[in-house]
From Swiss-Prot:
Keywords, comma-separated and alphabetical: Chaperone, Cytoplasm
Protein source organism: Nitrosopumilus maritimus (strain SCM1)
Species lineage: Archaea, Nitrososphaerota, Nitrososphaeria, Nitrosopumilales, Nitrosopumilaceae
Family classification: Belongs to the prefoldin alpha subunit family.
Name this polypeptide is given: Prefoldin subunit alpha
Entry keyword Ribosomal protein: no
Compartments where located: Cytoplasm
Its biological purpose: Molecular chaperone capable of stabilizing a range of proteins. Seems to fulfill an ATP-independent, HSP70-like function in archaeal de novo protein folding.
BP terms from Gene Ontology: protein folding
């Protein structure tokens, strides 16, 4: 393997490491959205059982206003692109469950891509180790870039 090929391999390894880190960040984002959607469903179910609940409404910078929830059948749901719609509890739960299915697919896809990237990283590390051994056996000192 030539010096140029070794440098290309190292660049590929760096790109793969960056890609793997990006996938990990995406996976964490998806997991956060998944937890949030699951918690929202549980909250809606709780509200349907106890409609006259006390709660805290955030008004910014860690400040909350105590209030009572008076609606036992409607909820405002952000559906994206700055659009919010009013839905009854079962419809809101159904919408959130559909979103959870989409998120689960995205998590699985991201996990598969991460596994592939990890495999390619391991192969690259093995190639680097072989290169280092070959260079040591030939008496050629490894050059750092």
């Amino acid at each position: 393997m030539s010096q140029e090929q070794a440098e290309q391999l190292m660049q590929q390894m760096q790109m793969l490491e960056t890609y793997f880190a990006d996938l990990s960040q995406r996976e964490n984002t998806f997991l956060g959205v998944f937890r949030e959607a699951t918690a929202a469903i549980e909250s809606i179910k709780s509200l349907s059982k106890n409609p006259e609940s006390d709660t805290l409404v955030p008004i910014g910078l860690g400040t909350y206003v105590p209030t009572k929830i008076s609606s036992d059948s409607k909820i405002i749901l952000n559906i994206g692109a700055g659009v919010a719609v009013e839905k009854d509890f079962p419809s809101a739960i159904n919408y959130l469950e559909e979103r959870i299915k989409e998120i689960e697919i995205a998590i699985q896809d991201t996990a598969a891509k991460k596994q592939d990237a990890a495999q390619r990283l391991e192969q690259g590390k093995a190639q680097v180790n072989q290169l280092m051994q070959a260079m040591q056996q030939s008496g050629q000192p490894p050059k750092s870039g």
